[in-house]
Amino acid sequence: MEAIAYSLAFTFLKIVIVFSLALGIGAYLTWFERKLAGHIQNRLGPTVVGKFGILQPLADALKLATKEVIIPRGADKPVYYAAVVMALVPSILLLTIIPFGPGFRVGNTYIEPIIADVNIALLLAFAFGSLSVYGTIFSGWASNSKYAFIGSLRKAAVVIAYEVVLGFSVLGVILLAGTLSTVGIVEAQIQKGVWFIFYQPVAFILYLFCMLAESGRVPFDIQEAEAELVTGYNVEYGGMKFGAFPLAEWYVNVIALSAIAVVLFFGGWDGPHIFGPLSPYFWFVFKTFALVFFTLWLHWTLPRFQAKDITEIAWKILLPIAILNVIITAVVVYAF
């Protein structure tokens, strides 16, 4: 009984730590992205609040917290509020199946730096990723606004198309690793001595497309499309509720999907032991934020696709390539 209570308490502690870090890092990615955008556009970015504008996220949070919240006339209030939760929670839940490093011992206790080490981790990742679109759909429907509704429909169309491509892009990795466990996939790469990016470069490119589409990043941000829909599905939200949507979709989601990409294609925590026992955790964080940086950089360098082109690219180009990649991988795995 004591062992069960201890295990539950320790799991709860890991949940609090991971979720707090995700929200905190996600908030500070807003500052980093604005600095990056300023550098790309030959300006300084945030400079006023704190040295180098480092306290800008705190100022933004204070501003949003003190904003007046105006609910549109005719809005479905229960669904209106539930949409915020449905947008934020699935993005955070994605972090529960990510192994941040190898297990280690502290005294007689074996600690695994993952919240849910289950054999169907990737299946859960797909489930959590699919749930996030409901927050978008609920917000568009409940807001009683044509701009919000059109934005939510666009997001739903993108997710339906790219979830299929995402599933096929990951199938090749599953065939190579022989497991749906994220820990097992990392261990398979370490055992083979080769990261799956070298076996599955096409799958990684497909995954990158899907990651940008799922997180609503340029060139796939047609659900916001400021020139067409103001800010899209969350246009009728104010205060902290308004900030919760980009925090979930643009930042926490990008962190989670980048971390999953590291697990699938870049060997997870595998890397040279240059920092002693901390090396695995360093390499995992380094690889993850290298992908996050790449995603943010693309956002400020690429133009937006037209709405009609995005789903056509998925169904007519990416999906056939993904299916062909799975067939070739299956033949090679079966033959060798």
Curated annotation (Swiss-Prot):
Keywords: Cell inner membrane, Cell membrane, Membrane, NAD, Quinone, Translocase, Transmembrane, Transmembrane helix, Ubiquinone. GO terms for cellular component: plasma membrane. Its main location: membrane. InterPro entries: NADH_UbQ_OxRdtase_su1/FPO, NADH_UbQ_OxRdtase_su1_CS. Its EC number is 7.1.1.-. GO terms for biological process: aerobic respiration. The chain crosses the membrane at residues 12-32, 84-104, 118-138, 156-176, 193-213, 247-267, 274-294, 313-333. GO terms for molecular function: oxidoreductase activity, acting on NAD(P)H, quinone or similar compound as acceptor; quinone binding. It catalyses: a quinone + NADH + 5 H(+)(in) = a quinol + NAD(+) + 4 H(+)(out). It holds the Pfam family NADHdh. It is a multi-pass membrane protein. It is found in: Cell inner membrane. Belongs to the complex I subunit 1 family. NDH-1 shuttles electrons from NADH, via FMN and iron-sulfur (Fe-S) centers, to quinones in the respiratory chain. The immediate electron acceptor for the enzyme in this species is believed to be ubiquinone. Couples the redox reaction to proton translocation (for every two electrons transferred, four hydrogen ions are translocated across the cytoplasmic membrane), and thus conserves the redox energy in a proton gradient. This subunit may bind ubiquinone. NDH-1 is composed of 14 different subunits. Subunits NuoA, H, J, K, L, M, N constitute the membrane sector of the complex. NCBIfam families: PRK06076.1-2. This is NADH-quinone oxidoreductase subunit H. The gene is nuoH.
